[in-house]
Amino acid sequence: MTNANVDATQLTTKPSQDGFYMPAEWAAQQAVWMIWPYRPDNWRSAGAYAQATFAKVADAIGGATPVYMGVPQAFLAEAQKVMPSHVTLVEIDSNDCWARDTGPTVVVNAEGECRGVDWGFNAWGGHNGGLYFPWDKDEQVAAQMLKQHGFARYSAPLILEGGSIHVDGEGTCMTTAECLLNANRNPDLTKEQIEALLRDYLNVKQFIWLEEGVYMDETDGHIDNMCCFARPGEVVLHWTDDETDPQYPRSKAALDVLQNTVDAQGRKLKIHLLPQPGPLYCTEEESKGVTEGTGVPRTAGERLAGSYVNFLITNDRIVFPLLDPATDDIAAQKLQDIFPEHKIVGVPAREILLGGGNIHCITQQIPSGK
């Protein structure tokens, strides 16, 4: 266990000026970060079920990549009991456990040096539809993770969650208008100004804008639940053939965009369709274990934004959520077809979904650089 309570060195330049860029998720990784779940107003039984699930996810990742977990001081003893012994526990305070969204985006240069981008965070909407208050501890998470690795830090003047962007490492950024252009994120910035900041801090050239993400996604439609890059020129899209399902028009609109765009290298995209599970709904029993607080209520009968696209690529593994016995095997086979060189590892992940996300949302990779 280590302590990361000191800020990382802050830079005054921008990554693109310094020759740094965000690599694709399939680039070599030196670590993956997670954060301990404990909010009783978001996780049933004060996080007990989620903690067991996070341990399984950490174990699956640990077969390919070292895992670090940020844990508030009060929960360190409990985390040591629950987490696999290979996980490095780091004392970090947080309001909740979404490492993808509160952690840093690590950028690299041609020499293999790593630095981190620390985005602004307002709990997915601040006082205009945000998911909890306060979020002051979450705002400090990225700097503490960067300090753990000794990486210098860029502070980006943009409210942005890591789950709202995907890159191919070759100049293309994919995102959703539903999230990035939402009035509850950066209301004073135009689309062009947001693109300019992403060019500065991710060092990308081309943008693929999907209109919306997954139906009922409380993050306002994060791209990482809807569509991701599999490799340069290839994407994986959340899909349903059921034209009566509220997800269908969203996925169909996304498909239309993807079929009629090119990436930063001028390539037409190969599109893999990954079928959605369910539909899945929160049960009475599951909602009962969540206490009232400042978090968004978890209501019985509410549709869950389940998606197999919410997987993590980490070195030679794909760690993906098992969500529905009727479709889990189909998803696993499809992922194996898309990633023939990778080991496909499924982890039962309904418990993460009940809290509002999935495996990609609770992880943040640290690229090797070299």
UniProtKB/Swiss-Prot annotation:
Gene responsible for this protein: aguA
Active-site residues per Swiss-Prot or TrEMBL entry: C361 (amidino-cysteine intermediate)
Protein name per UniProt: Putative agmatine deiminase
Keyword annotations: Hydrolase
A Pfam family: PAD_porph
GO biological process, one term: putrescine biosynthetic process
Statement: the UniProt record of this protein carries the keyword Protein biosynthesis: no
Entry GO MF terms: agmatine deiminase activity; protein-arginine deiminase activity
The organism's place on the tree of life at top rank: Bacteria
EC numbers: 3.5.3.12
The keyword Hydrolase appears for this protein: yes
UniProt xrefs under InterPro entries: Agmatine_deiminase, Peptidyl-Arg-deiminase_porph
Enzyme category, top tier: hydrolase
